[in-house]
Amino acid sequence: MRFATAQLAALAYYILSTEATFPLLGDIFNCIPHNTPPVCTDLGLYHDSSISLGGSKNKREAEIANKDGTIEKRTFGSAGVNAGFNAAFVVSNAKKLSDGSYGIDCNFKSDSSVQLNSAFGKKVKQLSITGTGYSDISLLGNVANPFEWSASLKVKAEIVKGKCCLPSGFRIVTDFESNCPEFDAIKQFFGSSQIIYKVNAVSNAIGTFDASALFNAQVKAFPAKRELDEFEELSNDGVTHSKRTLGLLLGLLKKVTGGCDTLQQFCWDCQCDTPSPSTTTVSTSSAPSTSPESSAPSTTTVTTSSSPVTSPESSVPETTTVTTSSVPETTPESSAPETTTVTTSSVPSTTPESSAPETTPESSAPESSVPESSAPETTPESSAPESSVPESSAPETETETTPTAHLTTTTAQTTTVITVTSCSNNACSKTEVTTGVVVVTSEDTIYTTFCPLTETTPVPSSVDSTSVTSAPETTPESTAPESSAPESSAPESSAPVTETPTGPVSTVTEQSKTIVTITSCSNNACSESKVTTGVVVVTSEDTVYTTFCPLTETTPATESASESSAPATESVPATESAPVAPESSAPGTETAPATESAPATESSPVAPGTETTPATPGAESTPVTPVAPESSAPAVESSPVAPGVETTPVAPVAPSTTAKTSALVSTTEGTIPTTLESVPAIQPSANSSYTIASVSSFEGAGNNMRLTYGAAIIGLAAFLI
C-alpha cells in the first residue's frame, strides 16, 4: 500500500512538473524541445552575491568620469562607453531535462521598455540568444516587446564552484535596421548597430536568492538621467535625418542607459534532490509440522533494495519485482504447507556463504546456500522448505536456482528470524528481526486457453483450366449481333482461366505445419511453388456462369457460277429456284419508294441469278416467259405480291435494249411486307427473234383501274390510321 501510494505521488509530480514554468513577466516563450521532458524541476537557484545591484553601473561611470566628477560630453559617440540599456535579468527557475541538459526560465526588462518599444521596436532586425551550448534562439516575433520578455530555453551548463551555471558565452543580441533615424541614434550613442549583453564571471561566492525580489530590486536600481548640456553639441557628421528627430531619440537613449552591458551570473543545483527509496520487509514462514529428520526453523526474507549487496562466493542475476508462490508439494516424511517467497528487488542481490541465525547438528540454517545446492533454503539433508519463483530469482539464492525445485519439510518453530537489508544513499545495512510464526498459503493457477483445429482441408496441387467456349453456329466471317455471351467472340479472344479444385474434401489429422504446393496458371502456362504455413483451413469455391444466345440459322455465302447452267438454290421456304441462262447475270435490284411515303426496304442480300422474297399468303404469282431460242432454260421467276394485287406479264425487251429492272411495290401500312419483283434482261444471240404480244387497251385500262382503286384504298387507310 505504501509503495503504491509513493508511485502515484511520483506520477502526479512528474505530470505537474512537465508544465511548471515560473515567468516573472506574464506570458513566456517556451523553446525547449518537446522530446526532452524534465526529469526534475525546482532546482535550487544561486547568484553571484559579491556584485551589488548598482555595481556594474557605478564601475562604468567611474571609468568615464573626470576629476571634477562630471561626465565628459565627448564620451557620447565613443564605441564601448555606453554598451547597452539599463536592464534587469534574472533566472527564475531551473530544471533538469531527460538528455542531461537544463531548462531555465529567463526574464529580461529594459529601463523604460514601453517607450523603447514605441521608438525602436519596429526597427529591430534581430533579437536572439546565443552561446547556450545548442542552436541559437530567435525571440523576434515570438515575444511582444523585444525590450521586455520571458523565455524558457535549453542550455548546456558550466560547472562553477560545484554548481551548474550559465555558459560563459551566453549572449543576448539586439540588432537594428540601417538607414533610419533610429539606426543613426543607436550608432551615434553606442558606436554600433548592435547591443550585446554578456554574462559576468563569478568573482567570489554564490548564494541563494528570491527571484521575484531580486528582479524588482534590479528594476528599481536603474540609474537616473545623466546631466548633459545641449544635444546639439554631439557629432552628427554624415546624418541625413533631422536633428530634431535624432535629438528626441538620443534623449530617450540617454535616459535608459548607464553604460552597463553585463548580466549577473546565475547557477543552480546539478542533481535532483529526491529522497532515497524506502525499504519494506515482508516475512512468511511455514506452518508447524513434524519431521523425523529435521528440527531447524524455516525463514523467508523479502528484501526491497536499490543497491547491490555482494558476497565473496556467489551472485545472482538482477531480479524484478515479482510476487509469486509455489504449489504445495509433500514428501513422504511430512505434510508441511508450502512457503511463499516474495521478492521486490531491482538490483543483483547475493548472500554470503552462510548467514544462519539458528543452526542444528542435522540441518543447515535457513537462508543459507551451499555451493552444490541450487534451491533456496536447502541443506544437504533437505531440511528447509523450498519455494519456486517463476521468471525471477529470489534474493539470497545462488545462480543455479531452478523454478521447479521440490518442496521439503522441516519442523516449524514459534519464532522466525528475518534478516532485513536496508539501502539508502549508496549504503546498505542488515538487521535481524525476530517475529512470530505466520503461515501464508498461496496458490497460482495457470489457465491455458486454446482453440483446437478439428479439420484440415489440403489445398489441391493441380487445377483444371477451362478452354475458350464460343457460341455454336457462328460463322468465321461474321459475328451475329444477337449473341450476348461474354465468351463468344472471334477465335483470337480467350476466356479467363478458371481454377476448379479437383478431388474430394477429406478430414485429416491436425498438423503443426503444412507444406502447400500452389499451382498457378495464367496465359496457358502453369507454375508450381511450395509454401510452408500453419494449419489454416480456408474453403473457397468459385462459380462461373456463362450465358450466351445460340445462333439458330447460318447463311453461307453463295458464289456465282460462270458458264454454268446448274440452278442456284436457297434454303428459304416458299421460294422457287429458277435456272440461270448461260452468260447471264442478274442485275442489282432497285428499290422503289412505297406509296404514301412508306419506304420499301430489303435487308437480305440476293445471290446472283436468284431472287429471295418471303411468300405472302394469298399472293398471286404470274411467271414471265421470255422467248430465247438458244437459251438452255427459260428464266422463271416467282414474284409474290401483296393480296389483291395482280401482276401483268412483261414481254422481253428488244435485243438492243440495255438491262433494266422494273419493280412493282405494294405496301400496307404496318402489316404487309414490301414485295419486289426483279425482271432480268437476257442477252440475245445474233440469230434470235422475239415475238411481242399485244396488249389490248381494255386489258390495260382494267389494270390501271385496279391500281387506282388499290392506291385510293391504301391512301384512305393511311390517313385514318
Swiss-Prot record:
* Residue ranges the record assigns to the propeptide: 697-721
Which Gene Ontology BP annotations are present? fungal-type cell wall organization
InterPro entries documented for this protein: Flo11 (IPR018789), Flocculin_t3_rpt (IPR025928)
Composition bias type Low complexity, residue spans: 454-499, 555-575, 584-663
Lipidated residue numbers (GPI-anchor amidated serine): 696
| PTMs per UniProt | The GPI-anchor is attached to the protein in the endoplasmic reticulum and serves to target the protein to the cell surface. There, the glucosamine-inositol phospholipid moiety is cleaved off and the GPI-modified mannoprotein is covalently attached via its lipidless GPI glycan remnant to the 1,6-beta-glucan of the outer cell wall layer.
- What membrane topology is given? Lipid-anchor; GPI-anchor
**Leader sequence segment:** 1-20
Which family, according to the similarity comment? Belongs to the HWP1 family.
The molecule here is called: Cell wall protein RBT1
Whose protein is this, by species? Answer: Candida albicans (strain SC5314 / ATCC MYA-2876) (Yeast)
Give the gene symbol. RBT1
